[in-house]
Amino acid sequence: MENYFYGDDKKTILKESLLTQQAKDWAKKFIQPSRPTGYDRNPPLSTAQLRKFYGEVKALETKIEAKGFEQIKPLIKMLKSKAAYSCPTRGGNKKIPDEFKIFLDEMVDHIEDKQDYKAFAITFEAVVGYFYGEGGR
């Protein structure tokens, strides 16, 4: 099975496309979500929400270093539920676009060890850079 984050089986070569074109594409989708805001609301990602989730990813990275990956893995998987809470399918106060929830779900689903988490954190950092570079606010 091909690794999601790496171009080799030893997980030493991070896929460049994740940090370049894919990161830029994700950032653009977060700024201009697929559906317009309105009744079926799909808001653009705010910098506050981006910082909230990115801050959580960085905090988990620190916890992994202190306590080990296996102990923190359930908290990593819980990022999906936090995204779901911020992106209800019906009613409620939708704080993040569907595209951002899909991004987090996809990333978290592919995290199986410490190396994968590091790759995810680096990929997220690239997305943050492109988000601001593409005019996110």
Predicted regions and their residues:
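Small/polar/charged residue-enriched interaction surfaces, especially the RNA/DNA-contacting tracks
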Residues: 1-137
